[in-house]
């Protein structure tokens, strides 16, 4: 990511960079123009760690791909996208229009998300409230003092309605990322976007922990070395020395 930001300026595309209603630490909306040249002539874009999915949604909306796979092991993220792509999106939008954020409900929703008994609809709504009203969209964070500035019902519901209009071309999954990568790799018409949690601060930012950076590096390099010519793999990371070691030793 750091290298992309510091690279030679690229021509701005007409892709919509703000389709997602989610705010995400490490989101790639600002890097869409830099990433676009690496995604050409592919039918399906697979997001192994989808999060807010700003890149995948922009590609689908622009007709650059014909199918989008949104995968996230975080059950809150999964429930949100599942509801947005189902007929229950209308009920979610009703909840959004009726809600006015206050700290009391923020903390109550944050606590309820820990329960395994929530319906997908409630989980999706609570998650959206926390995501929009917390610092940087971090699920475990405290609410921002200006919560209402981030909660704009009309804008949120319009984005959700827009995404739902593309739902025939979206598949939502709740799989282990490395299992999904291995499954999707064999189709040369796929581009698999691998954007794992930050190495340095991932535990502070995401409720679902991911410590398998070495195993991920081994999987990626093994697939590319032993079985070239299959899906394209697009990998983004925070620039850490350990990454250079992992990918150099596995090259």
Which residues make up each language-model segment?
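A cross-domain feature marking catalytic cores of carbohydrate-active enzymes
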Residues: 49, 196, 237
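Short, electropositive alpha-helical surface patch
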Residues: 242-251
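Conserved beta-strand signature within the Rossmann-like core of class I S-adenosyl-L-methionine
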Residues: 230-236
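SAM-dependent nucleic-acid methyltransferase catalytic core
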Residues: 3-34, 38, 78, 84-193, ...
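Charged helix-capping and loop-helix junction motifs
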Residues: 209-215
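Conserved S-adenosyl-L-methionine
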Residues: 38-104
């Amino acid at each position: 990511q750091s290298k992309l930001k510091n690279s030679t300026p690229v021509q701005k595309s007409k892709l919509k960079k703000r389709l997602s209603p989610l705010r995400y630490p490490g989101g790639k909306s600002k890097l869409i123009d830099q990433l676009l040249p690496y995604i050409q002539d592919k039918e399906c874009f697979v997001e192994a760690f989808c999060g807010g999915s700003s890149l995948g949604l922009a590609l689908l909306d622009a007709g650059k791909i014909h199918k989008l796979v949104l995968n996230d092991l975080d059950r809150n993220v999964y429930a949100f996208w599942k509801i947005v792509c189902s007929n229950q999106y209308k009920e979610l939008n009703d909840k959004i229009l009726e809600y006015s954020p206050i700290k009391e409900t923020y903390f109550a929703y944050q606590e309820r998300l820990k329960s395994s008994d929530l319906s997908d609809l409630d989980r999706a709504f609570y998650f959206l409230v926390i995501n929009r009203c917390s610092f940087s969209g971090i699920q475990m964070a405290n609410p921002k003092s200006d919560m209402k500035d981030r909660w704009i019902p009309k804008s949120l519901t319009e984005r959700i309605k827009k995404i739902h209009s593309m739902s025939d071309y979206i598949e939502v999954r709740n799989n282990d990322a490395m299992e999904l990568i291995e499954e999707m790799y064999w189709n040369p018409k796929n581009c698999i976007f691998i954007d794992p949690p930050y190495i340095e601060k991932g535990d502070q930012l995401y409720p679902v922990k991911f410590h398998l950076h070495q195993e991920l590096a081994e999987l990626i390099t093994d697939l590319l070395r032993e079985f070239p010519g299959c899906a394209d793999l697009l990998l983004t990371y925070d620039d850490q020395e350990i990454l250079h070691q992992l990918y150099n030793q596995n090259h």
